[in-house]
Amino acid sequence: MRRRATGLLRRDSRFVLDNNLVIASVKSGWTRSTDLLFTIILSDAELYCDLELLNEYEKYIHKFLGVYPLFVLLRNRITLVDPGIDSLMSCKPYFPESQYADVVHAATCLKTAAVMITNDAHFKKINESGLIEVWNISRAIKELLG
């Protein structure tokens, strides 16, 4: 990942943050996942999100976990993307029929050339194909926090 001399992520770093990272960051107090989330949010990295993921953020962060300021911070920090039919169709074969939201998230990564950070095993096949790059949370912590 590209860093400046200050150690901060550069503007040309691009990510889509799956909801499971955000939940892991807040459900058990301050953890390395929390460090990761805020390092990314407060950096110059580009953050992308599709409408499906934004709705997941709202549902889990705001309504279930009650951490409205984090939802507002994420909502204001991300660039909302419509992945488009071509990206959706390219990603669809790698996911079970029941995982439509994951297809949309992957298509968002494909359209924006962003790294997906997730612990969702449904992304394994598409990562192995090389169509998009997927990091689990542990790898993201290692890559971005050292």
What are these regions (language model features)?
Residues 1-5, 54-55, 121-146:
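Acidic, PIN/NYN-like endoribonuclease modules and their adjacent C-terminal/linker elements
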Residues 1-17, 25-26, 43-44, 140-146:
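Feature 3881 marks metal-assisted phosphotransfer/nuclease machinery
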Residues 14, 62-65, 71-93:
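Mobile, glycine- and charge-enriched loop segments
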Residues 14-17, 27-63:
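PIN/NYN-family metal-dependent endoribonuclease catalytic core
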Residues 43, 74-77, 128-130:
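Short, structured coil segments at secondary-structure junctions
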Residues 80-115, 119-121, 125:
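Active-site neighborhoods of divalent-metal-dependent phosphate/nucleic-acid chemistry enzymes
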